[in-house]
Structure formats: structure tokens, C-alpha cells
């Protein structure tokens, strides 16, 4: 039996667990506002807004200055490096603004995907070099949790054993480094929705990927109570001819999680994976109403599915800021209800029903 060398003190463990539980308190989820500079171009260009640092600041300000209604449905906000050091018009630091509202500040720490040689177009994620020092600095600058995204795709030949193992180990190494610096790691092994696979195939792959991740987290002595999982929902591929109900998606998703995710994990915050705003809320609601025992909070960590209507309403105009912020609040409240299984869909209306799917989505 391997000898156990304590990785974290009791105090460190308590701090990590407390942070994780605050983020996923009942009815709360995460606003993922950590789009990289390149990804912001994909958000701003379609609405005719130039992708400048100032326009990115103005847009994030519009989200972060939403009134107190979001305090009860947003438990954490994930920042991109640039955003962490930007200020509101009156000079208040964004991170401080969010913290003062009782919302936990997070930071994206990975440096993007790179090709994994010898595979059929698969990737691993870079960013471990210097991560410990960056985490120490981010902690000083107000961040209490972090995000790292690994990407896997489903095809006849993928994900390969190599890609599954490599990404699981990189996620575990990242998680371990974060915890040593007092930062709660969000573990995000995203299985892309690209392809024509059916629901069963996605469920099978999701189970294999999550099983590998939790084996790696155990091997790396990661304290599970001080982590969150950010998985894809189990859905059929975008090109699959069969359409499944939200109840079928919920059953497949909860079954996969129950088979692989230890109850010790503090929470599961789903990514929206290019679903429309409405779909993301309806599916989350069905997951919370799934008639199986669910030992973790099941909530959201949405980017596009919280922001699409707000972006459409804003279009870069100062006169539209109030309306845009209202759209964001509306989606945040909808998802806060869905996280408790209390969301009633009003049917797909306007921008909320638009698919947000991007092929081979890279941040």
C-alpha cells in the first residue's frame, strides 16, 4: 500500500470545501465570463462591435453591474486574466465588485488546447508551466476558484485511450496545484457535441471519461470535497437524426454521473455546450427532476447560454445597456430556478431559442 503523505492541512481542506459549497449553494450557479480575447471576437463581431479592450470591458461591466436579483442565482463568476484587472467606469475593480456582492471570483488558468501527436486530431490542454506561481498571484488578487478545460470528441476512432488518459492526468495535476494554493479547481472534461452519435454512445463515452478523471484525481491525492465538476450533459451529437426529450437527456446524464462521480464532490456545474438558452434551462430543470438519487448539487456554469440574449440586445450601444442587463438577469433567474427543478418554460421565444452551437468549439 502506498504511504500517505498529507497534501493539505485540515484548515486548507475546510477553506476549499467552504468555497466550493458557496459557489453551488441552493439555486446558485456560475456565470462563465472567461472568454479569451479571440473568443470575444466571435461574440462581438456578429453584433457589429469591434473587439477592443474597452468594448470587452463595457460588455463585462454590463453583466457585472446587474442589480441584486442576480445575487441569489449567481454563486461564482469565472474571469479571463484581462477582466480580473479591469475596472468599472467609476474605478471599482471588477473582482472587488463581484466579491463585495458575496459572489465568488474565479479565473480561467489553462492556455488552450494543443494537438496530441499520433491521434486522429485529438488534443490535450497546456498551461501547467508556472501554474503554481500564477495561482498564488490570482489568490492574492481575489480569485478563490479556477477553471481548466480539456476537450474530447466522439467519432468512430475517438476519444482514444491516450487522449482520455492524458487529459485526465493533466486535469488532476492542475487540480492538485490549485488546491495547494487555496484555489478550488473546476475540473472540465468537455466532450464536444459534434458528430452524429446517439444518446447511448455519448453516455458510454461520458462514463469512460469521468471514470478516468476520478481515477487520476485519486492518484494525485486531490481533495474531492474541495473540487467542482464541469461536465457536458449527455446529449446526442448535433448531426444525429434522432431527437431526444429533455427527460431522456436527464436520465442519461444523471445515470452517467451516478456511475462515475463520487458523492464527495461538492457540486456539478454543467456547461451549456452550444445549446440554446432555453434548451440549457429546460435540460437543467429536467436533470434536477430526474427520479434518481442525486448526491451533489446539479447546477450551471454557462457562458453563451447566459449571455446570448444580452449580447443581441446590447449591440454595443450605451442606450441598450439597461435592456441587455435585463436579458442577462432573466436568464440567470431562469437557470437559478432550473437548478432547483422549478423552472417553467415559456416556450422558445426570440433569441433564447436560437442554437448557440459552434463546430469544434475552441475558446
From Swiss-Prot:
Which Gene Ontology terms describe the biological processes this protein takes part in? fructose 1,6-bisphosphate metabolic process; glycolytic process
Instruction: Report TM segments.
Output: none
SUPFAM superfamilies referenced in this protein's UniProt entry, alphabetically: Aldolase
Residues the UniProt record annotates as site (Necessary for preference for fructose 1,6-bisphosphate over fructose 1-phosphate)? 363
Q: Which keywords belong to this entry?
A: Glycolysis, Lyase, Schiff base
Gene Ontology cellular-component annotations: cytosol
Q: Which Gene3D superfamilies match?
A: Aldolase class I (3.20.20.70)
Give the pathway listed in the UniProt entry for this protein: Carbohydrate degradation; glycolysis; D-glyceraldehyde 3-phosphate and glycerone phosphate from D-glucose: step 4/4
Q: Which InterPro entries match?
A: Aldolase_I_AS (IPR029768), Aldolase_TIM (IPR013785), FBA_I (IPR000741)
Q: Which residues form the active site?
A: 188 (proton acceptor), 230 (schiff-base intermediate with dihydroxyacetone-p)
| Binding site residues for substrate | 56, 147
Q: What is its EC number?
A: 4.1.2.13
Q: Which reaction does it catalyse?
A: beta-D-fructose 1,6-bisphosphate = D-glyceraldehyde 3-phosphate + dihydroxyacetone phosphate
Kindly name one Pfam family recorded for this protein: Glycolytic
List, in alphabetical order, the Gene Ontology terms for molecular function in this entry.
Answer: fructose-bisphosphate aldolase activity
- PANTHER family of this UniProt entry? FRUCTOSE-BISPHOSPHATE ALDOLASE (PTHR11627)
Kindly state the subunit structure of this protein.
Answer: Homotetramer.
What family name appears in the similarity comment?
A: Belongs to the class I fructose-bisphosphate aldolase family.
Protein name per UniProt: Fructose-bisphosphate aldolase C-B
Organism of provenance: Danio rerio (Zebrafish)
Lineage at the top is: Eukaryota, Metazoa, Chordata, Craniata, Vertebrata
Q: Which gene encodes it?
A: aldocb
